Amino acid sequence: MTMTDPVADMLTRLRNANSAYHDSVSMPYSKLKARVADILKAEGFIAGWKEEDAEVGKKLTLDLKFGPNRERSIAGVRRISKPGLRVYAKSTNLPHVLGGLGIAILSTSSGLLTDKQAGKKGVGGEVLAYVW
């Protein structure tokens, strides 16, 4: 069966693994998921990610990040734009997550960017997710 929303599946796996204090989580690989993982790593929400060969296709493994006393680095994740209801933001009206403490991940003509990067470049796009 095909997956209708691979990004939502990725975020759900990440949320569930984070809640269960797992050290890593695996999922089917795609370029879009790898770019989302790049943003999460650059913003300090995950420790790293790697692409691995599986029996069928490839898989993406995210290494979760925790504080010294096993505090979660990700407090929450929310999918915003869904296949049934796309959500777009203009460059003049970009979302701010928790007053700037979290990030919004946008799909723009310049690739995947955070809300801060999109604001600096002056581009808008589809709001994929909020992470805080």
Swiss-Prot record:
Q: Which GO terms describe its molecular function?
A: rRNA binding; structural constituent of ribosome
Q: Which InterPro entries match?
A: Ribosomal_uS8 (IPR000630), Ribosomal_uS8_sf (IPR035987)
A GO biological process this protein is involved in? translation
Key words, A-Z: Ribonucleoprotein, Ribosomal protein, RNA-binding, rRNA-binding
Q: Which Pfam families match?
A: Ribosomal_S8
Record's SUPFAM superfamilies?
A: Ribosomal protein S8 (SSF56047)
Entry's Gene Ontology cellular component terms: ribonucleoprotein complex; ribosome
User: What is the role of the protein in this entry?
Assistant: One of the primary rRNA binding proteins, it binds directly to 16S rRNA central domain where it helps coordinate assembly of the platform of the 30S subunit.
Q: Share what the entry says about its subunit structure, partners included.
A: Part of the 30S ribosomal subunit. Contacts proteins S5 and S12.
Under the heading HAMAP family, the entry gives: Ribosomal_uS8_B
Q: Which PANTHER family match?
A: 40S RIBOSOMAL PROTEIN S15A (PTHR11758)
State the similarity comment: Belongs to the universal ribosomal protein uS8 family.
Quote the protein name from its UniProt record: Small ribosomal subunit protein uS8
